[in-house]
Amino acid sequence: MNLDKLDENRVEMALTKLAETNELHAALGGQVNYLAEGIKQAKAHSFLLSEGGVSEREQKAIASQKYADALDAHLQAYVQFKKIDNERQHEQRIIDIWRTLSSNRRQGSI
């Protein structure tokens, strides 16, 4: 990024982006946590429905379609969450750089 073009308008855009994505970020974070619990429940459910020894039942639970579906749902939610999280972190870095540059300008360092 060209730091000469980092002005108040760009910082305002960053703040707007952060404000507009607050709820989505929180919702996706909650969904990721919820689906992580769903993975455990799917595995436990498949384990309880299986027959055999503990090790065999564990392997059957991990190989079950219900467990695979839960993993897939979690992965999809996690990818969406990380995408918005990374975008928000980028905007936060823009704001942090702006603060540093502004401070340096006030002190006469730049």
Report residues per predicted region.
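Short acidic DE-rich linear segments
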Residues: 1-5, 104-110
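Short, charge-rich amphipathic alpha-helices with coiled-coil/heptad character
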Residues: 1-23
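Short A/G/S/P-biased low-complexity tracts
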Residues: 12-15, 64, 97-106
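Short, glycine/alanine-rich amphipathic alpha-helical segment
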Residues: 51-80
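Long amphipathic alpha-helical coiled-coil segments
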Residues: 29-32, 36-37, 72-105
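Extended alpha-helical coiled-coil "stalk/arm" regions
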Residues: 29-60
